[in-house]
UniProtKB/Swiss-Prot annotation:
Purpose: Involved in uptake of biotin and desthiobiotin with the concomitant entry of protons.
Keyword Ubl conjugation part of the UniProt annotation: no
Topology within the bilayer: Multi-pass membrane protein
Region described as Disordered: spans on this chain: 547-568
Gene3D superfamilies: MFS general substrate transporter like domains (1.20.1250.20)
Listed GO MF terms: biotin transmembrane transporter activity; dethiobiotin transmembrane transporter activity; solute:proton symporter activity
Protein's recorded name: Vitamin H transporter 1
Pfam family for this entry, one: MFS_1
Keywords (A to Z) from UniProt: Biotin, Membrane, Symport, Transmembrane, Transmembrane helix, Transport
Location of the protein in the cell: Membrane
InterPro entries recorded: MFS, MFS_trans_sf
Membrane-traversing stretches: 85-105, 123-143, 158-178, 187-207, 222-242, 257-277, 345-365, 384-404, 411-431, 439-459, 470-490, 508-528
Protein family according to the UniProt entry: Belongs to the major facilitator superfamily. Allantoate permease family.
Amino acid sequence: MASEWPETSRASSVEENPKLNIPEIVESVSDSKPSLKNQFSTTVIDSSDLNVFNDGAETTVKEQEFTSSELRRLQKLRLKMDLRIIPCLWILYFLSCCLRFTVSLSFTMNTAQGHSLIQTLSGYSAHYLALGLALFYVGYIIFEVPSNLMMAFIEPRIWVSRIQLTIGVVGACHAVLGTKHGNAQSYVALRFFLGVAESGLWPGLAYYMSRWYRGKHLGKRIGWYYTAAQIAAAAVSLVSAGFQKMDGARGLYGYQWMFLIWGVVAIAQALSIPWWLPAVASKEHRKSLSSFIPLPKWMKTLSPQRIGFLTPADKSLHSRYIAEMNVGKRWQWSDLLKSCLDLRVWPFILMYFGIVGVGNGIFNYCTLIIEEINPSFSGIDISLLNAPIWLADALGIVTVMPLYDRFHKKFSFFTGSCLIIIAGLAVANYAPRAWSRYGGLLMIGFGLGPTVPICMAWCSASMAKTYGDVGVASSLALVTGLGNLGSVVTTYALYSGWPGDPTFRKSNDVCIALIGVSIIACGIEFLLDKTGFGQFNASFNNHDHEVEDEQEMTDIKPALPSSQQADA
């Protein structure tokens, strides 16, 4: 909108556009907003600049585009946010993944000395091992939605810090399994509580990111910190060799040192998060966790709220930039129900079900699949061949996600990645040579990499525009919670859980079908997004229309001299 109106005949303009005569409009609203009359008593709007009260249509203002200088400022602002936010989230997710992966490593650490978790755990049996693995997902799924919804009530960075803190505490408590108090029942309980502690982390991180970046800038950045999982898988294997050297030090087994050290590091990082991550813009209904805890005055000086991040000018620009994501809108419980019943959520769940199920199935049984491809491979060979598959996964993320953010072709990039997975599964199943089949595993890893970040970014952007905070929190929790049932299917019903499939080829065929389901669900999601079918209107949208009518009137005013602007 121009700051100064063109020098045209005001009389003719009023005659040609009688509905655009602001004095008449102001008279109709002067009873409720007397101050508006003084601001607009001499202003006439040209219909080429603005469409206001036109033939009874809803009041709208043409969206103000960013100027070239503002676009350059936005680039610098996003870089500033990247440098502050991404490293913290990457380290956070890396440490949480390390604590998750260390449990499986403890089964084989220091086996020659008889000091592995399996060898030292009282009452151990294969039944308890499977039960512990299953209950991890049960705890994760049950508490996923309530944990993520807490971010709509409590400042997100505080809740993320709480999640990481409990992950570190429960992870460190696994060291108890090597003492006289440890037994199979305590192992099962700790696995369950680790799932409860981790619930809400992955969707919570995506929710937090959606409060800082628009949907078109979200996918690449989710992919950046998602690479922490792949790096963690390789890192814990290498670092575990060092922990095995510590076996017997101060009377502790090697795996006990591993649990303790990773847990303490995670706890330390969790305590730094409130000062490291910037606070999300919020309304008065969101409370800080510290507001419920009485603190002495000297501690208030160390409050995270006192740590500055954005300048007032940056905050103003960011507010305009992030407006389409409906950050901080006041919502009602009916909006939560609407977001859960929105038809778009359920295709996302099926998309996530297929890709995460196949991903966890392949990666959990990857060493066994490599061994089946060539039984002559030694244990060291298998370990060395396992790492490149994770690296291929990370390569897929850093290669595809920048292109995804650049071209915004959600359906094309997701289905393209899924087709690479299907091709990889087919090669791993039916290629005549062992190394060709191993190449199929690399293809699977590359294709799987970008699928989860695309799914999360797409869901965040779609639901934020319709339901705001509560829509993002609830939908991401449902997608990751129910979608992780795919992991249960592939982990326990396929591969080693399928007695009639010793070569794993039937399991790979089922995985191809699961990826096919993800592709079909992606097509349905694309159509629902385009047509708007199955969506509901959030309660805050009705309130916003009333507010916008008043806000537009305050925005439409003639340019004032600098002295008068200062008074205003």
